[in-house]
């Protein structure tokens, strides 16, 4: 099964015909959404329960994990330990997990998260924390894809039942992360299409959020990506 979804549910006026859409309205058009609300702060359990109730049974969420979990937030300001942080996050997400509307928790690491023994050990901690829950890992440092590491990295992802996110993003000379279609978890595959706007990807001004993924794929690019999606769909359940 192939599910198509967008990032956030409220900002797609061309989809719903409204400037600000509700999750209920979005869910009448697409069967999946990626949400990053929890990345900026763990939401109340009641709020997550409201999201779950707003969508039909066959709807699924890709939920980006709290920034502290992906080594990008100052979790020490709010939690006494990593275990307390994880407990708070999983408690918040309980309605999503129990409803079986979770497609995957997305752990999106930054470009500084390189292929080191320490970071491999941290990935093992993530699997331990989340037990058998579906986890999609996005690696934004090209050291993981170097010829002397990539085979071991893919095997590690398989052994830990991680779904390595297949990413299409701008190829920055200093840190080119390749489009690498490969199934590491036959239960689910997650593609993310960030566009190919190199200048926007590197923007660091006040408008960087609007520029980062500002890109219009042409017909041939869409055809090429669609072919990859179809091929991977034959190797995974979803």
Per-region residue spans from a language model:
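Residues lining hydrophobic/aromatic ligand-binding pockets adjacent to catalytic sites
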Residues: 1-238
């Amino acid at each position: 099964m192939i599910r198509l979804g967008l990032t956030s549910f409220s900002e797609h006026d061309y989809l719903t015909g409204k400037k600000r859409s509700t999750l209920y309205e979005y869910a009448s058009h697409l069967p999946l959404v990626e949400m990053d609300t929890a990345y900026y702060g763990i939401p109340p359990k009641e709020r997550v329960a409201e999201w779950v109730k707003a969508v039909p049974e066959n709807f699924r969420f890709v939920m980006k994990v709290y920034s502290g979990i992906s080594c990008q937030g100052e979790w020490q300001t709010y939690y006494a330990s990593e275990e307390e942080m994880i407990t708070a996050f999983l408690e918040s997400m309980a309605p999503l997990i129990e409803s079986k509307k979770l497609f995957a928790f997305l752990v999106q690491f930054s470009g500084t998260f390189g292929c080191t023994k320490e970071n491999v050990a941290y990935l093992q901690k993530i699997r331990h924390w989340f037990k058998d829950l579906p986890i999609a890992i996005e690696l934004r440092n090209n050291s993981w894809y170097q010829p002397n590491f990539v085979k071991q990295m893919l095997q590690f992802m398989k052994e830990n039942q991680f779904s390595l996110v297949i990413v299409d993003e701008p190829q920055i000379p200093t840190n080119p992360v390749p489009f690498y279609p490969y199934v590491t978890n036959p239960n689910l595959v997650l593609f993310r299409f960030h566009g190919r706007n190199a200048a926007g990807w590197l923007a660091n001004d006040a408008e960087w959020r609007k520029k980062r993924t500002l890109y219009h794929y042409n017909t041939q690019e869409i055809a090429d990506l669609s072919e990859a999606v179809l091929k991977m769909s034959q190797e995974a359940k979803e």
